[in-house]
Amino acid sequence: MQTTPGKRQRRQRGSINPEDIISGAFELAQQVSIDNLSMPLLGKHLGVGVTSIYWYFRKKDDLLNAMTDRALSKYVFATPYIEAGDWRETLRNHARSMRKTFADNPVLCDLILIRAALSPKTARLGAQEMEKAIANLVTAGLSLEDAFDIYSAVSVHVRGSVVLDRLSRKSQSAGSGPSAIEHPVAIDPATTPLLAHATGRGHRIGAPDETNFEYGLECILDHAGRLIEQSSKAAGEVAVRRPTATADAPTPGARAKAVAR
């Protein structure tokens, strides 16, 4: 059921500014969703005429772009950093924190993950944050290509889990119900005994729940750990095979004998 936004006392003409409009848009979107947010509805929420909003934002997309920029700088860029010295735990915390941030705030999910329209400035900031994360993974022992792929895999895993959960909730609120594969009727012990046994023990197929998210995340971390171990082992073998400069260089006595000959 859609919440009816509360009506504020009407503001004086010229008393609104872009920051107030963006803040009000976030408040209203929390009540009615991004899809149902409209300029006239926002005007009523803020207590101003809709022309006051159009003075700063010509269309809804312009307002949503401004909301996205603020959301990224305020929420997403505040997630924990990845540290080279403790890469596994900090990367795990980074992924969990990112997922929780989006899962706890559907407006952020709709703006950043589903709509995914970033200004050039915000895109550059996002690239700089990814650069730091990948640099620390390289310092931890991954090659540049592996560090890029590992961070990309974690990012896709987080985003996929959050978006799938968000779309599922939207579908349920619209009355569509669970997906066909998750419906109890689809899993018959007589025809799909393995599925029935697994789901009977709490496992869910393709569900963006905690169990599936953690399993996927640990698989990525385990793979990264193996790559770092292989890289470290290969570097050690090269160091053992490489002769030292002192071992190759002739001693002063040997040089003297060679000259005498």
Curated annotation (Swiss-Prot):
One Pfam match: TetR_N
Keyword Disulfide bond (UniProt): no
Extent of Low complexity compositional bias: 241-261
Cell membrane recorded as keyword: no
GO BP annotations, alphabetical order: negative regulation of DNA-templated transcription; regulation of DNA-templated transcription
InterPro entries reported for this sequence: DNA-bd_HTH_TetR-type_CS, Homeodomain-like_sf, HTH-type_TetR-like_transc_reg, HTH_TetR, Repressor_TetR_C, Tet_transcr_reg_TetR-rel_C_sf
Compartments in which it is found: Cytoplasm
GO CC terms: cytoplasm
Record's note on what induces expression: Autoregulated.
Domain HTH tetR-type: residue ranges: 15-75
Binding region for DNA: 38-57
UniProt-annotated stretches for the region Disordered: 234-261
GO molecular function: DNA-binding transcription factor activity; transcription cis-regulatory region binding
PANTHER family in the record: HTH-TYPE TRANSCRIPTIONAL REGULATOR RUTR, HTH-TYPE TRANSCRIPTIONAL REPRESSOR FATR
Task performed by this protein: Negatively regulates the expression of the efflux pump Rv0191 upon chloramphenicol exposure. Acts by binding to the Rv0191 promoter region.
Protein's recorded name: HTH-type transcriptional repressor Rv1353c
